[in-house]
Amino acid sequence: MIKLLIDAHVFDGKYQGTRTYIQGIYSAMITHKDIEFYFAAQNVSRLKSIFGIAENIHYIRLDATNSIWRLAWEYPRIIKKYKIDYAHFQYICPLIKCCKEIVTIHDLLFLDFPKYFPLSYRIKNRTLFMYSAKRADLLLTVSEYSRKEIKRHFKITEDRIYVTSNCVSMVNDKIGLTDVKAKYGLDKYILTVSRIEPRKNHQMLLKAFLELQLYKLGYKLVIVGAMDLKNKTFSTLYKSMTDEEKESVLIFQASYLDLSLIHI
């Protein structure tokens, strides 16, 4: 039986696409009884609530909170202890190779659009992502665009890069949806869902909302997503708003699969 380790530390942090990707793939794969799945994260209870309990599913509690310590020491130790055959990592693999590795690189936007990312971020991740991509036994990405960009930036032939496309999450159509107006005070609204960072251009959306004075027409701007990279333009604009304007702009966090978001 194949032993497959999944680096699931992303489930310990804020909601993001990488988390949804892992959840989607392995919610489908865990039905394969000829594979033993080892999910590793600090919040094991959260993983259990998502992937459930089965004979072929195991959970490993991570001790390291520091990514360097986790990749340099903890994962090599786990791989040896549990005699793992394959390990699946997002973007960056451990310093030492102890088994066959699956690496998913979702995108290289910091290389495609460098002006939106700090120099230190670009230098560090270019080095680590390239090292991981070239060393991977199985290299995955999520779109043909990313596949071509990985080839271009890292000089890796396309036949080594496999696309595992992002998909729409299936939602139980029997869920009783709450009245959005009653629950959130929303009637007419504009919705955007993503982390708040410069390249997502929330600042332009907010500026347009204010310049058109849509709040005076009864509209609200609903932003679902955590503040990620510093967005000074957005923060400055938001702080300059009047109380009336701020009452029409709602910012809150929710899982991409959370009922709160589904309701909205």
Question: Model-derived features: where do they sit?
Answer:
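Carbohydrate transferase catalytic cores enriched for Leloir-type hexosyltransferases
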Residues: 1-262
